[in-house]
Curated annotation (Swiss-Prot):
GO terms for biological process: cytoplasmic translation. One of its GO terms (molecular function) is rRNA binding. This is Large ribosomal subunit protein uL6. Belongs to the universal ribosomal protein uL6 family. GO terms for cellular component: cytosolic large ribosomal subunit. InterPro entries: Ribosomal_uL6-like, Ribosomal_uL6-like_a/b-dom_sf, Ribosomal_uL6_a/b-dom, Ribosomal_uL6_bac-type, Ribosomal_uL6_CS. The gene is rplF.
Amino acid sequence: MSRIGVKPIIIPAGVEVTIAEGNLVTVKGPKGTLTKQLSAELNIKKEENTIMVERPTDNKKHRSLHGLTRTLLDNMVVGVNTGFEKKLELKGVGYRAQKQGKKLVMNLGFSHPVEMEDPEGITVEAPNQTELIVKGIDKQLVGNYAAKIRAWRKPEPYKGKGIKYVDEVIRRKEGKTGKK
């Protein structure tokens, strides 16, 4: 039995969920609307203010889809209600970031500044020059965009320079020791 899949999803006030033919789920809330095509092999039932995901058989495919489908639905409900955010931190001499309209401009030690356009449904805030906050209602888009920003300069293990998530711990290495 899937421990995650059997948990009911509670729909908070102000969030509206509609399940169409073939498990096309639309979730509307105060922050926006998300639509996702989920696996048609599972049964998604809506009762008053809860959603339940049930699987028809106990074969391996249905077991694996059970928890996944439930988590995707829960992420949609949480996203339209409260939203998701990822915080990034720039460490290094001269590493800076700033917003220019819908563009993110970063100085990361290259010969040119790195410019990134905010994708649809994602907002990036720069409270100061060394912090970035990626916000949105779709958890996958927020995570992917934060990872794209981080990929420009991953943190290196010697001094910790680069772009890292705020809660990320970098395994540090000791540098070379000179002859004595």
